[in-house]
Amino acid sequence: VGDVTIVTSDSRFRLSETSLGIPPAQIAPFVRERVGLTHARRLMLTGARFKGDEAVNFGIAHLVVADSEELEEACNEILSDISVCAPDANAFTKNILFESLRRPRSEVLDYAAAGFANCMLSPEGNEGVAAFIQKRKPYWVEGSLRK
């Protein structure tokens, strides 16, 4: 399961396990989380084929582009966007999101608050706030002067 998934309009998908006589056991929970129970049932029980635009509609992909050239451009844009975000902050953000699937909301809020405080006191957090105040790029951004 990718954080950001880009497909071409002619990308082809199929959850074909049941047509092979086996259940989609390993992927089923992830597909159900991503597309919902109703779509997961149809896609898995029929082995339905679908293309890139439908993958976006199902929530399997985030963006559909016309061809491989546009795919490379879109990937570069996404990577550029990610590169301006602090690596540790992104890692903890992913942890919060995954914990929100496993824990009650009140526990996740406590977990997130503690992590926020730790990040604010970390070298990365200090650098991010200082860079913002000083109107400069933080050290993790390509092309910044500080490392």
Regions found by a protein language model. Name each.
Residues L43-M44, A55, I96-S100, A114-M120:
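Helix-loop "lid/cap" segments that line or gate small-molecule binding pockets
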Residues L109, S122-G125:
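Amphipathic alpha-helical segment in the mid-to-C-terminal domain
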Residues V1-D88, N126-A130, R136:
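Crotonase-fold acyl-CoA enzyme core
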